[in-house]
């Protein structure tokens, strides 16, 4: 009886190995990609802090693109930056942590065939962590990428913001075009 039970356990474990490998690869992708993007984000912010005084610009492309050291105590596009409260930085840190947890839960629940969504979530996760690090260290986010035409400036942003924006674009793209997995299953059902 014991040998039969151990064979059944080996079969169960062997059956689950592909699932474990897929899950491992999914989280390995999250770890490697997000670690790389977070390091790049923090390195660029460190270099800006080291070499560009606050509210000072370095021209990169005349009349179009500068590196401008700006501190944003609010959220995207400087929203809430004029709100003065001692609790604001802590509230934004708390909201960031909740958002990061939600992203991880959604990432975990995302199917193995939803590579576009997984990539989008990894990008958003990376950006959220990058900006959270700023909020914890500085109580504000360091922005420096400044595009403009004449005196019309797009709000300054950073690598983390770019990750969030591109990640959201990936998820929206998946809603419209998908990655083909649902189309394959629909065609299979029709046959």
Which residues does each predicted region cover?
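Alpha-helical transmembrane bundles and membrane-interface segments of multipass inner-membrane proteins
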Residues: 2-191
